[in-house]
Design a protein with these regions (language model features):
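Membrane-helix and juxtamembrane interface regions of eukaryotic multi-pass membrane proteins
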Residues: 1-143, 163-184, 190-232, 236
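Alpha-helical transmembrane segments and their membrane-interface exit regions
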Residues: 151-162
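Transmembrane helix-bundle signature of multi-pass membrane transporters/permeases
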Residues: 149-153, 181-185
């Protein structure tokens, strides 16, 4: 059922993305004076990204606020493990995000967008992200997952909006880029390094630490290595 949910919303997001880009964002780009097709395409991609994260950034904070891991409480990520049941809004948020990242990975791998200079790095980033999403959901590390989602979503919103301003040659591009750098450092590095440190420490000491397939207890040395490696790869 969960797989079907993700598959369905991957398709829904694909159509939503195309509809918004062609019917709303392209006319907006033309109205704002972006005439070159290549620049229009980049603006459309970033504007859609900004719209998505403008919704899911606050949504993620709302869901986190209702959970024990507010505000990036790393010990709560491991207390009472495994976390096998969640309220509906948590599960919906998690799986909708899985749909978004799956859809983005498909766009990238099928080269539906013109490849950027950092194409290989972007592909690797998406592979790591999708692996983290599916493994965290399958093995009940969703409290860690929501924290990583939020750090990525909000920082990506500022990245996308910064790029949009740059395409528009906006006079506030410079100051806004400075704000983006601050947000990016705090979310992608400070908070994620905090989570990485917890993976090395609290992961072992807080809550059970053993492998037991019958009780779905997967917080053990194997998952610790895999989790740390994937999270570290996002920092690279």
């Amino acid at each position: 059922a969960d797989f079907a949910f993700v598959a369905f919303y991957t398709i829904v997001l694909s159509f939503t993305r195309e509809f918004l880009m062609q019917r709303m964002i392209r006319p907006l780009a033309i109205r704002l004076g972006i005439t070159r097709k290549a620049k229009q395409a980049r603006f459309m991609e970033q504007f859609y990204t900004a719209i998505y994260f403008a919704i899911f950034g606050p949504f993620g904070l709302y869901v986190m606020r209702r959970s024990p891991v507010w505000y990036f409480n790393t010990d709560a990520m491991f207390e009472g493990f495994p976390h096998r049941s969640h309220e509906a809004v948590f599960k919906a948020y998690y799986l909708l995000q899985a749909s978004y990242w799956t859809q983005q990975a498909i766009v990238l791998l099928l080269m539906l967008e013109k490849p950027r200079k950092d194409f290989k790095e972007l592909v690797l980033h998406h592979i790591v992200t999708v692996a983290l999403i599916w493994l965290s959901y399958r093995f009940h590390f969703t409290y860690m997952g929501i924290a990583v989602y939020i750090t990525m979503d909000i920082s990506d919103f500022f990245l996308a909006t910064s790029k949009c301003l740059n395409y528009l040659d906006s006079p506030i591009t410079g100051p806004y880029f400075g704000l983006f750098i601050g947000v990016w450092f705090y979310l992608r590095h400070y908070l994620n390094l905090h989570i990485l440190w917890a993976t090395l420490t609290s992961f072992r000491t807080v809550g059970p630490y053993e492998l037991n397939w019958e009780t779905q207890q997967y917080k053990c040395w194997i998952s610790q290595i895999i989790t740390f490696s994937l999270l570290f790869a996002l920092q690279a």
